[in-house]
Amino acid sequence: MAAEICIHNATVLNGFSTMKNCAVLIKKHKIIDVFNEDRFVKKTFKPDTTFIDAKGAYIAPGFIDTHIHGFGGFGTDDYKEESILKMSELLTEYGVTGFIPTLYSAPKENMINGINAIVSAMGKEKGAKILGIHLEGPFISPDRLGVQSPDSISPVDIDLMEQLWNASQGHIINMTVAPELKNMRELALYCISKGIVLQAGHTNATYSQMVEGMQARIFHVTHLFNAMSRMHHRDPGAVGAVFIHPELSCAVIADGIHINEDIVKFLVTCKSLDKIVLVTDALKPTKQRK
């Protein structure tokens, strides 16, 4: 890598504004300066600096995907370290710099094998960084399975949760649950003690059950609108709870297929942007090369 790289004639998204005709100076894989075209023209660079004309293209912080099962023909359901590492490598081609590999509900042995594979891959990445583990189950509603298998879900089971946690060596950071399940408060207390963020998803919860979930510190919602109780004027359900309570954050699969694009526009008029997380929920065949 050159001593310094300067990407100029770029549109920079810095999280606060859109900066046009800007340059970004990189040294040893780190951004050391961002400046406008006027400073770029006047600045004196080192003789071995490499210049790249972005031709107006965007430069933005890397994407972080908090809900992803697979990519490019590799997936968490392979239960293999090499599949997780391949996901890491391929995701960088699409601007992803960090991701949370997500496991569906599965028989205990498979879930533990999947957890072991992710833990084993951590620290060996050559691409996007593995930020932790997201368990999408097994404590979810049989009435809102989506594509998950009814044979793989489970009532709340603290002993099972402890086995999954121990296998993760402390790396489970998110878990999708159905707040209405019996003994959910007990599970929530356990997860709070471990620093696990609980998310309401694959849930048939009534509005009052969602409120009870919030009292148990379930403040995030998995793929809003998908696999959850709908909003109704007599019972707002899981969807309605997100719109009624500003403290609830939500993830959305904004691909125009899982939800209509105008629903996304509606959502951003109702929720603060810092309460909306874009996720892919991508599966193994996504961008698979033939």
Give the label of every model feature segment.
Residues A2-C6, V12-A60:
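Histidine-rich, glycine-flanked metal-binding segment
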Residues I68, P179-E180, T203, D255-G256, ...:
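Active-site metal-binding loops of divalent metal-dependent hydrolases
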